[in-house]
Curated annotation (Swiss-Prot):
Organism, scientific name: Arabidopsis thaliana (Mouse-ear cress)
Low complexity: compositionally biased ranges: 258-277
Keywords: Cell membrane, Coiled coil, Cytoplasm, Cytoskeleton, Developmental protein, Membrane, Microtubule, Stress response
InterPro entries reported in the protein's UniProt record: CHUP1/IPGA1-like (IPR040265)
Job of this protein: Microtubule-associated protein involved in the regulation of anisotropic petal and cotyledons growth and shape by affecting cortical microtubule organization. Prevents cortical microtubules organization into parallel arrays oriented perpendicular to the axis of cell elongation thus limiting anisotropic cell growth in the late phases of petal development.
Bias type Pro residues, positions: 26-40, 302-344
Protein name as annotated: Protein INCREASED PETAL GROWTH ANISOTROPY 1
Signal peptide: none
Knockout consequences: Reduced interdigitated growth of pavement cells, with smooth shape. Long and narrow petals and cotyledons, as well as increased anisotropic cell expansion of petal epidermis in the late phases of flower development, as a result of increased microtubule ordering in petal abaxial epidermal cells and in cotyledons pavement cells. Enhanced cortical microtubules (CMTs) response to mechanical stress leading to aligned arrays. The an-t1 ipga1-2 double mutant exhibits stronger phenotypes than single mutants in term of longer and narrower cotyledons and leaves.
Gene: IPGA1
Length: 642
C-alpha cells in the first residue's frame, strides 16, 4: 500500500492488472462464467511492471533502483489473498451446482416414478371398481341370506308348533282308540275280534300321512281290482254289521286329515315315515302264476263272473245252436297268422261274427237315396279321443315334486339305509319275472306297486339302487293297456239303455262308447308296432295284442252295442208312427252306425243281424209310406181346380 501511495504522489497510474486484481474479490450475485485463468504473480516487479515508455527509458530503469523490494512483496501478498477468495467462492459455487445437479437428478427420478405410477392408476382403478362391485354383491347376498335365514327360522318354528300339535292330536286319538278298544272288548268274541282289527286299521290310517296317499295316486293302477286282504275283509264285515259309531269316527278322522294344510301334511308324513322306516319292510310274496289264480283274479277284476271271456256277456243258447251252418263264410276270410294258438274263447268269439253284404248294400242305397243329408260329423270322435288321451296322460302323470326339506330328505335316507334288503328282493323279482299270459302281469304289477308304495318316495329311493326301470316300466305299460281295454269291454258289455231316457242322449252315449272302443283298437295297433319287440325282450306276452287277442273281444262288444243301438232306433220308429223328416233322420242315423260297426268288427252275429233286418224292414215300410203320401199329395194337387 505504501508503494501505491508513492506512485500516486509521483504521478504514476495504476496498472490494469492491479485494478483487475482489486476488482476481482467483489461478490457476484449470480454465478458468472468462469473467469480467464490468472497468472500468478512470481514477484512484485513482474506483477506491477509498468509499460516501458521509449521516451523515458532511463528514468524507468533508474526508478526501480530507488524503491526497495519490500513494497513489491506486500503487493504480492494482497493479490494472493484476493485470488484465494475467488477460488473459495468458485468452490462454493461448484458445490452449489453439484447440489443442484443432485437435486435435479432426484426430481427427474421422481418424475419417472410418477409417470410409471400414473400408467398403473387406470388398472388399479378398474380393479378397485371390480372389488367394490363384488363387495356390493356380497352385501346383497348377505342380506338375502339373512332374509332366507329368518324365513326358514319362522317356518321351522311353525313346523315345530305343528309337530307338537300333531303329537298332541295323536296322543288324544290313541287315548280314544284305547277307550274304544276297552268298550269293544266287552262284546262277543267274533264281533270283538273284527272291531279290534278295524280300529287297528284306523290307527294305521291315523299314522299314515297324506304323502303316502298322494304317492299311491301316482299310478293309474288305482282303478285295478284290489286284492282282498284280511284287513279289508274285516273292514267290510264291520261295515256290513252296522257299527255306526266307528263309521262316523272314521269319516271325521279322514275329513280332519283332508282339511290340514300342505305344510302340516308334509311335516307329519315325513316324521311318521321316518319313524316307520326304522323297521325293515317284510315284503309279501308275489302272486303265483297259475291258471287257477289267473281265473280267480280275472273273476275278481270283472264283476260279471265268466271264465273264458270276462267282459262281454255270453249270448243266449239259441244263437249258438243256429250258428253252426255258416262256417263256410268264416273260411272265406284269410286266417290270422299262426304265432301262438289263440284261446278257445277267442276262437268262439271270432266264429260268432260274419260279414253281411246286405248291410253294405242297404247302407249305400240309403246314402244314394238321402244324398242331400249331411255326412257324419266326425268331430265328436276326435274330441272324445283327445279327452281319452288327456285323461290317460293326467292319470299317469306324477304329482309335483315335494318341497326339499330336511325331514323329507332324512326320511329318504332312512329308507335307503333300512330298506335295502326289501328293495333288493323286489329287484330280484322284477328281473326274474317271465310271463306267458297277460292275465298274470296285471296282479304282478299291482303287487309291485303296493310294495313300492311303502317307500316315502319311490323315485328318490330307487335311484340309489340298480333298479330295472325299463323292465318295470314295460310291465306297467302292458298292464295298463290291457286293463284299460278290459275295462272298456266291460263297460260296453254292461251298458244298459234306460227307456225313460231320451233317444238322442241314449244314442249319443252309445256312439261315444263305440268311439272309445274304436280308439282303443287303434292305440293298441300303434302300441303293437312300437312295443312288441320291447315286450318280447322282457319276456312279456304279446299274443293278446294280435287281431285274434283282445281286439276280437272289443269287436264283439261293439257288435253287441250296435244291436242295442238298432233296437233303440226301431223302438223310436214305432213310437213316432207319423213319418216325416224325424223318422228318416232316425233311419239314416241307425243305418250309418250299423254300417260303421259292421266295417269295424268285420261283420255281425246272429242277434245283431236280426236287429238289422228289423230296422231294414221298418225303413222300407217307412219309405213306401212316404212314397204313397207323396203320390197322394200329387194327385190332390192335380185334382184341385185352378
Amino acid at each position: 500500500m505504501v508503494a501505491g501511495k508513492v506512485r500516486v504522489t509521483m504521478g504514476f497510474h495504476k496498472s490494469p492488472s492491479t485494478k483487475k486484481t482489486k476488482d476481482m474479490p467483489s461478490p457476484l450475485p449470480l454465478p458468472p462464467p468462469p473467469p480467464p485463468p490468472l497468472k500468478p504473480p512470481s514477484s512484485g516487479s513482474a506483477t506491477t511492471k509498468p509499460p516501458i515508455n521509449p521516451s523515458k527509458p532511463g528514468f524507468t530503469r533508474s526508478f526501480g533502483v530507488y524503491f526497495p523490494r519490500a513494497s513489491a512483496q506486500v503487493h504480492a501478498t494482497a493479490a494472493a489473498a484476493s485470488h484465494n477468495g475467488v477460488v473459495s467462492e468458485l468452490r462454493r459455487q461448484v458445490e452449489e451446482l453439484r447440489e443442484r445437479e443432485a437435486l435435479l437428478k432426484t426430481e427427474n427420478l421422481e418424475v419417472k416414478l410418477l409417470r410409471e405410477s400414473v400408467s398403473v392408476i387406470p388398472l388399479l382403478e378398474s380393479q378397485i371398481a371390480d372389488k367394490n362391485g363384488e363387495i356390493d354383491e356380497l352385501r346383497k347376498e348377505t342380506a338375502r341370506l339373512a332374509e332366507d335365514n329368518e324365513r326358514l327360522r319362522r317356518e321351522f318354528d311353525r313346523s315345530e308348533e305343528m309337530r307338537r300339535e300333531c303329537e298332541t292330536r295323536e296322543k288324544e286319538m290313541e287315548a280314544e282308540i284305547v277307550e274304544l278298544r276297552k268298550l269293544v272288548s266287552s262284546e262277543s268274541d267274533d264281533h270283538a275280534l273284527s272291531v279290534s282289527q278295524r280300529f287297528q286299521g284306523l290307527m294305521d290310517v291315523s299314522a299314515k300321512s297324506n304323502l303316502i296317499r298322494s304317492l299311491k295316486r301316482v299310478g293309474s293302477l288305482r282303478n285295478l281290482p284290489e286284492p282282498i286282504t284280511n284287513q279289508e275283509n274285516t273292514n267290510k264285515s264291520i261295515s256290513s254289521s252296522g257299527d255306526a259309531d266307528g263309521d262316523i269316527y272314521r269319516k271325521d278322522e279322514i275329513e280332519s286329515y283332508s282339511r290340514s294344510s300342505n305344510s302340516e301334511e308334509l311335516t307329519e308324513s315325513s316324521s311318521l315315515s321316518t319313524v316307520r322306516s326304522r323297521v325293515p319292510r317284510v315284503p309279501k310274496p308275489p302272486p303265483k302264476r297259475s291258471i287257477s289264480l289267473g281265473d280267480s283274479t280275472e273273476n275278481r277284476a270283472d264283476p260279471p263272473p265268466q271264465k273264458s271271456i270276462p267282459p262281454p256277456p255270453p249270448p243266449p243258447p239259441p244263437p249258438l245252436l243256429q250258428q253252426p251252418p255258416p262256417p263256410p263264410s268264416v273260411s272265406k276270410a284269410p286266417p290270422p297268422p299262426p304265432p301262438p294258438p289263440p284261446p278257445k274263447s277267442l276262437s268262439i268269439a271270432s266264429a260268432k261274427v260274419r260279414r253281411v253284404p246286405e248291410v253294405v248294400e242297404f247302407y249305400h242305397s240309403l246314402m244314394r237315396r238321402d244324398s242331400t243329408n249331411s255326412r257324419r260329423d266326425s268331430t265328436g270322435g276326435g274330441n272324445a279321443a283327445a279327452e281319452a288321451i288327456l285323461a290317460n296322460s293326467n292319470a299317469r302323470d306324477m304329482i309335483g315334486e315335494i318341497e326339499n326339506r330336511s325331514v323329507y330328505l332324512l326320511a329318504i335316507k332312512t329308507d335307503v339305509e333300512t330298506q335295502g334288503d326289501f328293495i333288493r328282493f323286489l329287484i330280484k323279482e322284477v328281473g326274474n319275472a317271465a310271463f306267458s299270459d297277460i292275465e298274470d302281469v296285471v296282479p304282478f304289477v299291482k303287487w309291485l306297486d303296493d310294495e313300492l308304495s311303502y317307500l316315502v318316495d319311490e323315485r328318490a329311493v330307487l335311484k340309489h339302487f340298480e333298479w330295472p326301470e325299463q323292465k318295470a316300466d314295460a310291465l306297467r305299460e302292458a298292464a295298463f293297456c290291457y286293463f284299460d281295454l278290459k275295462k272298456l269291454i266291460s263297460e260296453a258289455s254292461r251298458f244298459r239303455e234306460d227307456p225313460r231316457q231320451s233317444s238322442s242322449s241314449a244314442l249319443k252315449k252309445m256312439q261315444a262308447l263305440f268311439e272309445k272302443l274304436e280308439h282303443g283298437v287303434y292305440s293298441l295297433s300303434r302300441m303293437r308296432e312300437s312295443a312288441a319287440t320291447k315286450f318280447k325282450s322282457f319276456q312279456i306276452p304279446v299274443d293278446w295284442m294280435l287281431e285274434t287277442g283282445i281286439t276280437s273281444q272289443i269287436k264283439l262288444a261293439s257288435v253287441k252295442l250296435a244291436m242295442k243301438y238298432m233296437k233303440r232306433v226301431s223302438a223310436e220308429l214305432e213310437a213316432i208312427e207319423g213319418g216325416g223328416p224325424e223318422e228318416e233322420e232316425l233311419i239314416v242315423q241307425g243305418v250309418r252306425f250299423a254300417f260303421r260297426v259292421h266295417q269295424f268288427a268285420g261283420g255281425f252275429d246272429a242277434e245283431t243281424m236280426k236287429a238289422f233286418e228289423e230296422l231294414r224292414d221298418k225303413a222300407r215300410s217307412c219309405h213306401v209310406q212316404c212314397q204313397s203320401q207323396t203320390h197322394q199329395h200329387k194327385l190332390c194337387f192335380r185334382s184341385t181346380p185352378c
